[in-house]
Amino acid sequence: MKTTTEMQLVPISKLVPYVNNARTHSPEQITKLCSSLQEFGFINPAIIDRDFNVIVGHGRILAAKEEDIQEVPCVFANHLTEAQKKAYIIANNRMAMDAGWDEEFLRVEIESLQGTDFDSLLYPYHFTRYS
């Protein structure tokens, strides 16, 4: 197992989206990602290879472009083969879809945010469901 530790800010103009990325990003999702960037900043790095090809983070990068962010944090995964990159792109997206929610913990966390400065428009489904 190899752990990647190299991270740096990379100009968005250098990043190359994976042309065969099977994951799509709706305008609504990009809007939510833009709101997240405004609220929290770009704190979840993209994963790229040595040639600046994007492996993970396509949606966040699209949102960063919308927000006119010039550089984004990127982790370099230079140890992956071409086949591993393709497999990781699919696996990373699929694993997120397979996750679930502990509804009780979610309700408690959302209730604890009521009355704070937190922008509830970021996740309207969850907030309206539990408000």
Task: Identify the role of each PLM range.
Residues 1-131:
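Aromatic/glycine/proline-enriched transmembrane-helix motif characteristic
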